[in-house]
Swiss-Prot record:
Similarity remark: Belongs to the universal ribosomal protein uS13 family.
Gene Ontology cellular component list: cytosol; small ribosomal subunit
One Pfam family this sequence matches: Ribosomal_S13
Biological process according to GO: translation
Keyword hit for Secreted: no
Keywords for the protein's UniProt record, in alphabetical order: Ribonucleoprotein, Ribosomal protein, RNA-binding, rRNA-binding, tRNA-binding
Protein name (database record): Small ribosomal subunit protein uS13
Task of the protein: Located at the top of the head of the 30S subunit, it contacts several helices of the 16S rRNA. In the 70S ribosome it contacts the 23S rRNA (bridge B1a) and protein L5 of the 50S subunit (bridge B1b), connecting the 2 subunits; these bridges are implicated in subunit movement. Contacts the tRNAs in the A and P-sites.
Stored HAMAP family: Ribosomal_uS13 (MF_01315)
C-alpha cells in the first residue's frame, strides 16, 4: 500500500483516482501531478514502483499544500477574518452561511436544529 502525505492510498484503484484521497488534491491536480512526474494515470496503485511513489511524494511535497498544512492554513484564514471583523468573519462567528445564501427559510445545516419558541397561550373559556 502506497503512503503519500500521511494517507494510505487504496491499492485497487487507478493512481489518478487514488491521489484524490489526499485532502487538497482533486481530479485536476491529480492529473497535473501524474503528467509532471511521468506516471501513467491508468496504473493501479498496487503496480506502482517504489521509484514512482518516491517521485509522486517529492512532487506533491514540493508543489502543493495538502492534509494537515492545508487544514491549518484554512483555519488560520477563518480565525484572521473573525479577528479583523470583516463581514465573512462576522458570519463565521455567528455560525451563519458565509457566501451569501439566504437564511430566512434555509441554512439548517449551519444554524443547527430549530429552537422551539413559546407560542401565544390560548384564551381560556369563561
Amino acid at each position: 500500500m502506497a503512503r503519500l502525505s500521511g494517507v494510505d492510498l487504496p491499492r485497487e484503484k487507478r493512481v489518478e483516482i487514488a491521489l484524490t484521497y489526499i485532502f487538497g488534491i482533486g481530479r485536476s491536480r491529480s492529473r497535473d501531478t501524474l503528467a509532471a512526474t511521468g506516471v501513467n494515470p491508468d496504473t493501479r496503485v498496487r503496480d506502482l514502483t517504489d521509484d514512482e511513489v518516491q517521485k509522486l511524494r517529492e512532487w506533491i511535497d514540493a508543489n502543493y499544500r495538502v492534509e494537515g498544512d492545508l487544514n491549518r492554513e484554512i483555519k488560520q484564514d477563518i480565525r484572521r477574518k473573525m479577528e479583523i471583523g470583516c463581514y465573512q468573519g462576522l458570519r463565521h462567528r455567528r455560525n451563519l452561511p458565509v457566501h451569501g445564501q439566504r437564511t430566512h427559510t434555509n441554512a439548517r445545516t449551519r444554524k443547527g436544529p430549530r429552537r422551539a419558541i413559546a407560542g401565544k397561550k390560548k384564551a381560556g373559556k369563561k
